[in-house]
């Protein structure tokens, strides 16, 4: 995982369905190349292989619910993700929470397969517990702010700061990123100033009238943040 990073979660938005997922990913790819920054996209499972085959930037899966491929109807296994072209996976998003034992298995399994592993958590202490599992990054996202336009970096900066302090002190090799309500370049800049190494966002980019321009705005603060 190249840091700092902007991760765009397509969720199941109609604006990022089918060919629109590729168009959105290509807009992100264009910005990444023009600015020289790290941008990853997380399309819906249905579009994952299509997007992965269409762009050169990192493509992450939005989640997983089976460790190994096999007779699991309507499930998605870690092996399936890798075969589809994913290079990373987001785990334990508040919209797709996991039991601790499953989360631990998926973190270990994902890393063993060479996937970037990002674990979401709602608060500093849970983020610390998630970091103990050894992912590449934890994304602290207060669920009450997700999708509200009220950026965590402005409305709950203490949550971000505490998470950075705890994780950095105990698991310095685990990056802290943040999300929830991120809508603007200013929000991203504020998050980076608080000590994070990136942001995870969705609707700000996916629902933008001009995704390219919006992603450009959101990604520009990464340039100044520079490598670790």
UniProtKB/Swiss-Prot annotation:
Substrate binds at residues 9-11, 146, 181, 202-203. Its main location: cytoplasm. The keyword Isomerase applies. It is found in: Cytoplasm. It holds the Pfam family TIM. Its EC number is 5.3.1.1. The active site is at 93 (electrophile), 141 (proton acceptor). Coiled coil: none annotated. GO terms for cellular component: cytosol. Involved in the gluconeogenesis. Catalyzes stereospecifically the conversion of dihydroxyacetone phosphate (DHAP) to D-glyceraldehyde-3-phosphate (G3P). This is Triosephosphate isomerase. It comes from Pyrobaculum calidifontis (strain DSM 21063 / JCM 11548 / VA1).
């Amino acid at each position: 995982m190249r840091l700092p990073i902007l991760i765009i979660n397509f969720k199941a938005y109609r604006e990022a369905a089918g060919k629109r997922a590729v168009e959105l990913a290509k807009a992100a790819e264009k910005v990444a190349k023009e600015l020289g920054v790290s941008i990853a996209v997380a399309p819906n499972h249905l579009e994952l292989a299509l997007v992965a085959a269409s762009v050169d930037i990192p493509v992450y899966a939005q989640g997983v619910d089976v460790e190994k491929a096999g007779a699991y109807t309507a499930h998605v296994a870690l092996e399936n993700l890798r075969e589809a072209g994913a290079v990373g996976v987001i785990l334990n998003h508040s919209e797709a929470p996991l039991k601790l034992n499953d989360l631990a298995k998926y973190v270990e399994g994902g890393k063993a397969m060479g996937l970037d592993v990002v674990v979401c958590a709602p608060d500093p202490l849970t983020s610390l517990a998630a970091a103990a599992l050894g992912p590449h990054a934890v994304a602290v996202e207060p669920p009450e702010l997700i999708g509200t336009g009220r950026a965590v970096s402005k409305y709950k900066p203490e949550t971000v700061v505490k998470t950075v302090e705890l994780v950095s002190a105990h698991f310095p090799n685990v990056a802290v990123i943040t999300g929830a309500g991120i809508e603007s370049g200013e929000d991203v800049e504020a998050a980076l100033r608080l000590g994070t190494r990136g942001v995870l966002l969705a609707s700000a980019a996916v629902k933008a009238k001009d995704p390219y321009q919006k992603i450009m705005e959101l990604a520009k603060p990464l340039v100044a943040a520079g490598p670790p």
